[in-house]
Amino acid sequence: LIATVKRELLVRHLEAWAPAALHRARRVIYAHGYADAQSGASAEAAARVLAEQTDFVRGRELTMLLVGDDVTPVADRLAGIPELALLSMHAVSGGTEERFGVALKAASAQRVPLLGFLDAASASEPPSPATVAALTAGKPAEVLLALAPGVSAEAYRAGWPLFTAVELATGDEPGELLAFGTTSGKSLEGFKEALWAVDEFAGVRYRDPADPDRHLIDISLSPHPGPLRREILAHLGRVGSATVTELRTFALTETIYRAADATRVLHTLADSGAVTRRPPHGRLGGDVVISLP
């Protein structure tokens, strides 16, 4: 079930990323690490999304890198799918940890739109920070990274101006961690929209790694605000006061929620007297200062 949620998130993100990247640049690269995991199911899903972009591709170069322990069977299978005939694919075996950075260099992935997907949740070891950081050579650059339960995403933040993580959980025990790093604020907003728009799969819920109460949240277009409320109050306890704009940015970058969710929570907190606002009346605009009473 968690694999299905990850795959749907990847597909949704690719559907938004690929046309925008092809509109921006003549060369675009998508790099899929651990591509032989789960018999290449997520690699095939990604390839099908990219192949649908052939309308955009005329006169442009869209390349998919498949990197893993032994990706030849996956690459051969994908090569036999007629719909994928126009997609340029390069398969690199020998291990994601060992070959990912090398494959990016060989594909001249510097200063071109670059998205990497690394599902290391079932790998024997998580990728090194250097392997993930190799993607920052792109411009703009993005990464979707899945980690096994209990593995922290903190070591991977370096090099990414914007970085967020969400736990995919089925119960009280720690779940897989899905991290997203990007150089684009607009892309982070798009990822958050996709996060809450995926189909609700029975038993799979989100947990915000920053929520001290480890509250499980149903996947919904209107997510339960409890964890965000706690995180905003804790943040205000640390910083003293912040503008609405700063708190919207905090929600977007430091929690699993969207900026719009923060606006709704701030209205509720202000109306209940849990926070004070300056000025005390009028619209809750971006420059209104929020603090604890």
Specify the residue positions occupied by each region the protein language model found.
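Short, aromatic/basic amphipathic alpha-helical patches
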Residues: A46-L50, P73-A85, T131, S152-Y156
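Membrane helical hairpin/interfacial module
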Residues: V49-L78
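S-adenosyl-L-methionine
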Residues: L1-V57, D70-V112, T245, I256-V275, P279, ...
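Residue-level recognition of the N-termini of beta-strands and the immediately preceding loop/turn
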Residues: A25-I29, G59-M64, L87-M89, L114
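Flexible, charged surface loops at secondary-structure boundaries
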Residues: L22-R26, V57-G59, A107-R111, A137
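Structural motif
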Residues: G33-A37, L66-D70, G94, F117-S122, ...
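Class I S-adenosyl-L-methionine
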Residues: K105-L114, S122-R278, L284-L292
